[in-house]
Design a protein with these regions (language model features):
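Flexible "arm" and connector segments at domain edges
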Residues: 1-123
């Protein structure tokens, strides 16, 4: 028999956990649209993206860079998602809104890939 702990967390539960954590840091009036806080977390996201590339240097063109640490890369990608959650929280974007936007954009990208000529005609 499966229990709740057998299922991965949902975006909504992760979002709520991150809101709780931000409140522990003293940001009690959230979620809300706060451009300054959003900008702070965007900068943090850029930093974390750089750390992903440091955890897996196989993307570099020279053959000397073979560094790859799966767990480190996984943790840095998780940090990126956390910063993206914060960007949503400080943009007053709900989990439902972001999931629907992601779904819409994926479908739009698939449509464009399947029919690139139609996309060019619309420009």
């Amino acid at each position: 028999m499966m229990t709740m702990s057998d299922f991965p967390p949902t975006l909504t539960s992760l979002y709520q956990d991150q809101v709780e954590f931000q409140k522990l840091l003293g940001n009690t009036d959230i979620p809300k649209d706060d451009p300054n806080e959003m900008a702070h977390h965007l900068l943090g996201l850029v930093t974390e993206v750089g750390e992903v590339s440091q955890a897996d240097k196989r993307w570099k063109k020279n053959k000397r860079n073979k560094h790859y640490n799966f767990q480190e890369k996984l943790d840095e990608i998780a940090d990126c998602f956390i910063f993206l959650l914060n960007v949503c929280i400080y943009s007053d974007i709900t989990p439902w809104q972001i999931l629907n936007a992601i779904d819409r954009k994926i479908n739009e990208n698939k449509r464009r890939f399947k029919s690139p000529e139609k996309d060019e005609e619309q420009k």
